């Protein structure tokens, strides 16, 4: 397990302090730390079984949407009343948390848990889109571009798996990575299925 479920992952680090904090966070979960180029785009999980793409989802980081009335803390409480949300993997979705990572994300927007975001403003509480950290998933199987599908199948075949999940970053999954960029973040030999 090195960084599974988004543990120890930090993205969009822009200052030396953020890099140092991200490195320290990663070291809490593994003695080895990998630093990679940041790829712009939405987080997708492409599920390949026996050489076929069987499902694709776009994952969105845990967030709240402002209403101009309630604080971020109150909005988190409201989101967490959704009966589909639980602790860990007990339910389809995981409850949102106001913790150090959420504080860092809010600080980037010059906000705190006591801030009242304007109506329709999205406030991300995580930089990664894992369901295990409060993220949500949207099915995109029917719109994935054939080049992106084939790339996922080739990746899983290249590492010798019958079942695998490809974490793929793209600004538009319906367009080819060959024309708009994007790329594989990682391949998972034991991918979670609950997002599909």
Residue ranges of predicted features:
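ATP-dependent carboxylate activation and anion-phosphoryl transfer catalytic cores
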Residues: 38, 48, 52-55, 60-67, ...
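A short, surface-exposed helix-loop junction/capping segment
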Residues: 2-4, 113-137
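Active-site nucleotide/adenylate-binding loops and adjacent lid/helix of ATP-dependent enzymes
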Residues: 1-97, 145-150
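Oxyanion-binding "anion nests"
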Residues: 78-124
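Glycine-centered small-residue hotspots that permit tight backbone geometry or close packing
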Residues: 3-6, 120, 164, 195
């Amino acid at each position: 397990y090195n960084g599974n479920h988004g543990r120890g992952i930090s993205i969009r680090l822009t200052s030396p302090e953020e890099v140092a904090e991200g490195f320290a966070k990663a070291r809490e979960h593994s003695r080895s730390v990998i630093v990679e180029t940041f790829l712009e785009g939405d987080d997708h999980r492409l599920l390949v079984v026996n050489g076929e793409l069987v499902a694709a989802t776009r994952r969105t980081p845990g967030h709240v949407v402002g209403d101009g009335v309630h604080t971020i803390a109150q909005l988190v409480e409201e989101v967490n009343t959704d009966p589909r949300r639980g602790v860990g993997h007990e339910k389809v979705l995981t409850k949102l948390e106001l913790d150090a990572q959420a504080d860092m994300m809010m600080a980037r927007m010059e906000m705190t848990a006591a801030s009242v975001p304007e109506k329709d403003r999205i406030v991300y509480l995580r930089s990664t889109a894992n369901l295990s950290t409060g993220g949500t998933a949207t099915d995109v199987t029917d719109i994935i571009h054939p080049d992106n599908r084939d790339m996922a199948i080739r990746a899983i075949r290249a590492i010798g798996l019958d079942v695998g999940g490809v974490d793929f970053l793209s600004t538009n999954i319906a367009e080819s990575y060959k024309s708009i960029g994007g790329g594989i973040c990682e391949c998972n030999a034991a991918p979670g299925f609950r997002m599909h």
